C-alpha cells in the first residue's frame, strides 16, 4: 500500500464510527493496521514471520468460558458424569454436594493476585480420573472452578473479538510448565526414553534429545528466542529465573534445560539465538531487541517470546499484567507495517495451572480394554514409575489460543482440535516446500488428532478491517513487589454462568464423522462403527449410562473406520452409550439387544450428510417382526416432531433442512418408552465454507 493509499484509508475511517477505535492506537499502530495482509501468493507462503508467545497457566474456561460464540459454559452437549449430571457439577467430598463454576467476589479481578493451584502429573491425572473428569475439586481445591469475564480481562476478550480464538486448543500433556514447553520446542518429553526422558515435571536436570530449533538451524530457517537475561542465562543465573519477577524469563526458555544449549559457546547458533536477550537491569526495556529487529526488517522466520514472571500471567500474578505485556509485543510487531503484513502471532498458554475446563481432552487408549485406534499409539502411554501413576501423555485440558495476524482478523472461532505440537506442524506447513523441517519427535497419534492451525487462517481473502483494542496503560504494574495470594470463597448460592449473547463467525473444519450402531445378532452385543470420511483424524470418547466401567477412547484417521462391541449380559440386555467427538459432535445409542432376538420391533437409524447444502438425512429402518412408532425431534428451531410408523422391513428417509440453524443439528429418534429405543445425532455439517458458532450455546 502506498503512503497515499494509507492516508486515504485513514481518511475514510475517520468518517465512520471506526474512527474512535482507531484513535485508541498510537499513530504507528494506526498506520500498520492500514496495511493489508501480504498477498503475494494467497497461500500460507505469504507468512514470512511466525512469532509464538506462550504465557502461563490458564485454562480456556477460566478465561473465556463466558465469551460469545465459543464452546464455554453454555455448551449444550457437555460431558455427562457417572451420576448423570453435566461435568460442570463437580463433586465435593466435604461440604456441598457439588461446586459449579463461579466468579470470585472481588473488585478489579483482572488485577488480583489469584492463588496458584496444584498443576502436576499426579493431580492432573487425578482430576482426569481415566477420562471421567470428575475429581477436580479433590485434586485442585475449590478455586479450580473460579473464572474471569470480559469486565475483568477486556483486552483478552477484545483480542478474541478482533482476531481468531481457537476453542479446541489443548495443552499437550496433563502436567506442569516444562513438559508442555518441551512439547512446544521438541515435540515430546523424551517419551521413548532418549536423552534423559521421559520428563513429567519441572526437574530441569539437563536433557539430550533433539529440539526443533536445531531442526530449523540445520534446514537454514532463521529463528530466535526473545527474552531478558535477568542475572544470567546460565546455571549461576538460574537460566533466567530470578528473585526479581520483573526481569529475566521466569525459566520459561525451556531450551536451556537441554545440554546442547547449556554447553553452547558464544558465537555458536544455539548460544546466540537462545542465550542472549535484553538486560533491563542495566537499562532499556524488555522489548528493545524485538523492536530493533522489527525496525531493521531482521525479524527471524520463527521466533519465540518468553516473558518475565510478573508478566507471564502465572498465578498469583494478575492476568492484566500480561495484557500490558502482550500489547507491548503487538506495538513492537506492528511498528514496521511491512513486517506486520507478513507476520502471524500465536498467543497461547503452556498449561491450565489447576483451573477447570469442561471439555474432556482426547487421549490414546492405554490398552485394548480402553479402546482402539487406527493409528499407532506408540509413544503416547506412560507405563508408570515409583512416583508417577501410569496414564496417557495427553492431551491435557484446553488452554486459550489467540491467532493474531492480518489473515485472522474479524472475530472468528476455529474449533479444530489442536495442541502445542500444532505450532510445530504450522511451521512445517509453511516451510516444508523449501526446507526439511519435519519435527521428528511428534508421534503419529498426535499428528492424526491435532491439526496444523492452518484452518484458523484465511490466506486467499483476508479481512482488511482494523481491530478495536482497549488501552492497557492502566495495567502496567504500579509497584515492583510480590503480593500475597487472593483466595476466593465459593458463593453459598450457586448457578451456572451464561455466556455472552450472539453468534461468532466460525472457520470451516476438516471433519466428516459418522458413528453407526447396530445389534450384532451373532454375538448378542451392541456394535458401534466409527467412520471418518473427512480430511483430518478424530478422537472419540464413549461413556456408558448404565455401567461403571469406561470411558473408552477411539482414534480414527481420515478415510478410515473401526468398530467395537459392548456386552449387555450384566445390564439386563440394555445398552446406553454416548459418543463425544470434536466441535460438539455427539451420538447416543440406547435400547435392548433383545430386540434382535424375539418377535418385537428392531428399529435402527443411520444418517448421511448433504455436504453441498449443509443438510442431513436420517434413514429409519425396522429390521424386527413388529411395527414400531418413532418420533424425530430437532433441538434446533421450533419444528414440530415428525412421527413415523414403520412396518417390519420398512425404511424411511427423513430429510432435514438446516439453513436456519447454520447447518447445526441435534436430532433424536425415540420410540417413547422409558429406557426404550433412542438414537441421538448432534453436531455440524461441514461444507468447506465458513459458518457460525453453535446457536444452542446457552447465553444470558
Swiss-Prot record:
Q: Which residues form the signal peptide?
A: 1-34
- One annotated GO biological process: lipid catabolic process
Q: Which UniProt keywords apply?
A: Hydrolase, Signal
PTM text: Predicted to be exported by the Tat system. The position of the signal peptide cleavage has not been experimentally proven.
Q: Which GO terms describe its molecular function?
A: phosphatidylcholine phospholipase C activity
Indicate whether Cytoplasm appears among the record's keywords.
no
* Reactions catalysed, as given in the entry: a 1,2-diacyl-sn-glycero-3-phosphocholine + H2O = phosphocholine + a 1,2-diacyl-sn-glycerol + H(+)
Question: Which family is annotated?
Answer: Belongs to the bacterial phospholipase C family.
Question: What is this protein for, i.e. what is its function?
Answer: Hydrolyzes phosphatidylserine as well as phosphatidylcholine.
Q: What is this protein called?
A: Non-hemolytic phospholipase C
Recorded name of the encoding gene: plcN
Amino acid at each position: 500500500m502506498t503512503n497515499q493509499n494509507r492516508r486515504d484509508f485513514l481518511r475514510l475511517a475517520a468518517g465512520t464510527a471506526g474512527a474512535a477505535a482507531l484513535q485508541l492506537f498510537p499513530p504507528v499502530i494506526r498506520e500498520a493496521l492500514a496495511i493489508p495482509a501480504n498477498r503475494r501468493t494467497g497461500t500460507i507462503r505469504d507468512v514470512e514471520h511466525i512469532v509464538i508467545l506462550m504465557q502461563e497457566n490458564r485454562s480456556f474456561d477460566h478465561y473465556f468460558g463466558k465469551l460469545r460464540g465459543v464452546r464455554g459454559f453454555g455448551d449444550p452437549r457437555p460431558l455427562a458424569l457417572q451420576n448423570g449430571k453435566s461435568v460442570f457439577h463437580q463433586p465435593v467430598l466435604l461440604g456441598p454436594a457439588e461446586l459449579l463454576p463461579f466468579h470470585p467476589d472481588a473488585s478489579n479481578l483482572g488485577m488480583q493476585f489469584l492463588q496458584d493451584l496444584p498443576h502436576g502429573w499426579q493431580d492432573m491425572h487425578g482430576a482426569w480420573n481415566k477420562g471421567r473428569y470428575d475429581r477436580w475439586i479433590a485434586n485442585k481445591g475449590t478455586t479450580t472452578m473460579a473464572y474471569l469475564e470480559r469486565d475483568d480481562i477486556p483486552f483478552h476478550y477484545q483480542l478474541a473479538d478482533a482476531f481468531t480464538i481457537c476453542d479446541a486448543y489443548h495443552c499437550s500433556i496433563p502436567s506442569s510448565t516444562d513438559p508442555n514447553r518441551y512439547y512446544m520446542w521438541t515435540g515430546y518429553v523424551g517419551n521413548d526414553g532418549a536423552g534423559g526422558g521421559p520428563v513429567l515435571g519441572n526437574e530441569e536436570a539437563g536433557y539430550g534429545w533433539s529440539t526443533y530449533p536445531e531442526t530449523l538451524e540445520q534446514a537454514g530457517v532463521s529463528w530466535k528466542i526473545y527474552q531478558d537475561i535477568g542475572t544470567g542465562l546460565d546455571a549461576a543465573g538460574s537460566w533466567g529465573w530470578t528473585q526479581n519477577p520483573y526481569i529475566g524469563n521466569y525459566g520459561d526458555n525451556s531450551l536451556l534445560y537441554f545440554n546442547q544449549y547449556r554447553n553452547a559457546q558464544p558465537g555458536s547458533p544455539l548460544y546466540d539465538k537462545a542465550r542472549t536477550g535484553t538486560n533491563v537491569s542495566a537499562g532499556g526495556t524488555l522489548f528493545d531487541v524485538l523492536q530493533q529487529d522489527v525496525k531493521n526488517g531482521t525479524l527471524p522466520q520463527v521466533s519465540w517470546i518468553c516473558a518475565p514472571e510478573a508478566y507471564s500471567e502465572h498465578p498469583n500474578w494478575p492476568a492484566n499484567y500480561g495484557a500490558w505485556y502482550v500489547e507491548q509485543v503487538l506495538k513492537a510487531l506492528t511498528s514496521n507495517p511491512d513486517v506486520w503484513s507478513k507476520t502471524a502471532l500465536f498467543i497461547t498458554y503452556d498449561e491450565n495451572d489447576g483451573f477447570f475446563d469442561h471439555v474432556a481432552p482426547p487421549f490414546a487408549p492405554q490398552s485394548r480394554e480402553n479402546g482402539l485406534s487406527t493409528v499407532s499409539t506408540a509413544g503416547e502411554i506412560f507405563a508408570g514409575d515409583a512416583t508417577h501413576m501410569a496414564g496417557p501423555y495427553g492431551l491435557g485440558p484446553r488452554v486459550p489460543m489467540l491467532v493474531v495476524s492480518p489473515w485472522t482478523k474479524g472475530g472468528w472461532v476455529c474449533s479444530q482440535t489442536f495442541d502445542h505440537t500444532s505450532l510445530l506442524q504450522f511451521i512445517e506447513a509453511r516451510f516444508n516446500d523449501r526446507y526439511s523441517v519435519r519435527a521428528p519427535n511428534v508421534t503419529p497419534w498426535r499428528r492424526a488428532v491435532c491439526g496444523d492451525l492452518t484452518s484458523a487462517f484465511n490466506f486467499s481473502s483476508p479481512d482488511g478491517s482494523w481491530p478495536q483494542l482497549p488501552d492497557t496503560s492502566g495495567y502496567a504494574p504500579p509497584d515492583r513487589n510480590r503480593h500475597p495470594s487472593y483466595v476466593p470463597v465459593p458463593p453459598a448460592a450457586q448457578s451456572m454462568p451464561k455466556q455472552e449473547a450472539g453468534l461468532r463467525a466460525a472457520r470451516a473444519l476438516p471433519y466428516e464423522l459418522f458413528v453407526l450402531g447396530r445389534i450384532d445378532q451373532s454375538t448378542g452385543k451392541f456394535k458401534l462403527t466409527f467412520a471418518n470420511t473427512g480430511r483430518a483424524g478424530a478422537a472419540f470418547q464413549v461413556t456408558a449410562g448404565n455401567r461403571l466401567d469406561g470411558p473408552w477412547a477411539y482414534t480414527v484417521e481420515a478415510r478410515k473406520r473401526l468398530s467395537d462391541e459392548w456386552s449387555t449380559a450384566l445390564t439386563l440386555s440394555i445398552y446406553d452409550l454416548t459418543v463425544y467427538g470434536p466441535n460438539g459432535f455427539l451420538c447416543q445409542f440406547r435400547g435392548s439387544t433383545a430386540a434382535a432376538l424375539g418377535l418385537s420391533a428392531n428399529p435402527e437409524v443411520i444418517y448421511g450428510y448433504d455436504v453441498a447444502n449443509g443438510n442431513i438425512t436420517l434413514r429409519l429402518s425396522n429390521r424386527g417382526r413388529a411395527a414400531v412408532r418413532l418420533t424425530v425431534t430437532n433441538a434446533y428451531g421450533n419444528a414440530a416432531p415428525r412421527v413415523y410408523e414403520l412396518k417390519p422391513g420398512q425404511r424411511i428417509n427423513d430429510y432435514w433442512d438446516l439453513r436456519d440453524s447454520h447447518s447445526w443439528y441435534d436430532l433424536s429418534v425415540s420410540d417413547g418408552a422409558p429406557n426404550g429405543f433412542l438414537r441421538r445425532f448432534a453436531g455440524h455439517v461441514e461444507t468447506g465454507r465458513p459458518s457460525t458458532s453453535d446457536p444452542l450455546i446457552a447465553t444470558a
